[in-house]
């Protein structure tokens, strides 16, 4: 019988390493692949060098270096993202290029929490990473067990400061390097055969147990951003787009949300894909949705079709933003309060006015900043929604809605 027939049945979870430079994120990422590969032939090992030279990818007009690895435990299949540079982390988390269901915070026991440790925890809070598990690395370099307790306490305090449950978060102590060196010596090392390898398994157990399996997109309330609208003579108005979440079928009541002064309700009279009728459209499908009693003028690109009551239009919000550097194709100069770029949400640009927080005079290219935006038209918004900031069609920043104001 073929090995690896079970792959599809395991729940899938997205994770990633975060933490200060040189605390061992990439070494740990490599160790996770080696350790799980010893027990599972489906896992491909990735060594430090493979992960460190991460390929460039583009998300919302921004170039980001990101390494993706995959591994599995008996319970789950994981996609894991690791970024080589600090700026890459900021860009990655703000654009949501690699969404994380949970993060592994790596802290060197020899150094304790450092500036980027704090910055990454803050970012995780702002962009809505729901769970953090801590790996206290390099414990072989610290002789005094009391020092380890102290570092653990500092990390827990820091997590509490940013509204993570610091007292409940699992903290695993180990050495990614010693585990990786053991796996290099004997790639078949199993759980129970080496204390450092066992620490990696302890981390995997914590990830399995502590980070819940996310609700699949298809089980969330229906939402489809409208990309295009046309009329089918004799049948009515069709809105096309890719279903972002949930499902839709004939007879469902939906709301048309955003851009218009009023949200209006209508009923789905048909769902089509490549000109063929569908029983039901689900998350990820590109479909045309036929709407009852809606004229061609009453629905437009940039609106969303959604399950009634699941999302509302707003004009004012707070956002966490990364401003592109000049070398990344961004602005050459800073900007002030009153700056009026376009904000690109899902399928459309809407002009908005930026209000910087008290004490911040100016924002420079390369900055990571939080500010308030007031849009000239209402858009279907929710916390965690990503957007691009554009000027004359080019991307100058990326952001995520952290709080809806009105």
Curated annotation (Swiss-Prot):
Coiled coil: none annotated. Mg(2+) binds at residue 26. GO terms for molecular function: GTP binding; GTPase activity; translation elongation factor activity. Residues 19-26 are annotated as: G1. Its EC number is 3.6.5.3. Its main location: cytoplasm. InterPro entries: EF-Tu_GTP-bd (IPR041709), EF-Tu_GTPase (IPR050055), EFTu-like_2 (IPR004161), EFTU_2 (IPR033720), G_TR_CS (IPR031157), P-loop_NTPase (IPR027417), Small_GTP-bd (IPR005225), T_Tr_GTP-bd_dom (IPR000795). Residues 137-140 are annotated as: G4. GO terms for cellular component: cytosol. Residues 82-85 are annotated as: G3. It catalyses: GTP + H2O = GDP + phosphate + H(+). It is found in: Cytoplasm. Phosphorylated on a threonine. PROSITE patterns: G_TR_1, G_TR_2. The modification Phosphothreonine is found at residue 395. Residues 10-215 form the tr-type G domain. Keywords: Cytoplasm, Elongation factor, GTP-binding, Hydrolase, Magnesium, Metal-binding, Nucleotide-binding, Phosphoprotein, Protein biosynthesis. NCBIfam families: EF-Tu (TIGR00485), PRK00049.1 (NF000766), PRK12735.1 (NF009372), PRK12736.1 (NF009373), small_GTP (TIGR00231). Monomer. Belongs to the TRAFAC class translation factor GTPase superfamily. Classic translation factor GTPase family. EF-Tu/EF-1A subfamily. This is Elongation factor Tu-B. The lineage of its organism: Bacteria, Thermotogati, Deinococcota, Deinococci, Thermales.
